[in-house]
């Protein structure tokens, strides 16, 4: 099964892919495609997640990180944890997902601005490939950009 069958799959670079929640079969495809690390920003809600994604990832030889981000209340600490995980996996192929790639596209855009030299316009374009952020996320992104500019 091709990776582009995963909900909202996006190839960001040769080392970074993002998407919504993969199925068990799609997680096997992620491993078969050569990804080393899975980062899940979704909540452990049975409506949107696998029964035990950490165990499934481990059984496939994937390093697994779970950073539960509340879609209605994303926190600066969540973003810092994400940056730390991404920085630690710099030399690996990373697959980042949440339920629909909304949280992920926003976090990856901010990471791209901080680490890849993307402009805010490039970050916004990346996000809008997937969705139009609601007011909560517009505010979160703006606050994160202000903190980054201030060096916090």
Where are the predicted features?
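Cys-dependent protein tyrosine phosphatase-like superfamily
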Residues: 1-95, 106-152
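Short cysteine clusters
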Residues: 98
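Substrate/cofactor-recognition hotspot
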Residues: 101
């Amino acid at each position: 099964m091709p990776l582009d069958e995963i909900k909202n799959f996006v190839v960001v670079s040769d080392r970074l892919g993002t998407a919504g929640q993969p199925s068990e079969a799609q997680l096997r495809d992620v491993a078969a495609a050569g990804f080393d690390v899975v980062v899940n920003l979704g909540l452990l809600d049975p409506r949107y997640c696998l029964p035990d994604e950490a165990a499934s990832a481990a059984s496939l030889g994937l390093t697994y990180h779970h950073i539960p981000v509340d879609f209605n209340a994303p926190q600066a600490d969540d973003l810092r944890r994400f940056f730390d995980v991404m920085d630690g996996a710099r030399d690996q192929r990373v697959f980042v997902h949440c339920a629909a790639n909304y949280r992920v596209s926003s976090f990856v855009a901010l990471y791209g601005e901080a680490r890849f030299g993307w402009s805010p316009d490039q970050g916004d374009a990346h996000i809008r490939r997937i969705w139009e952020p609601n007011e909560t996320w517009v505010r979160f992104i703006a606050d994160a950009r202000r903190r980054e500019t201030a060096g916090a």
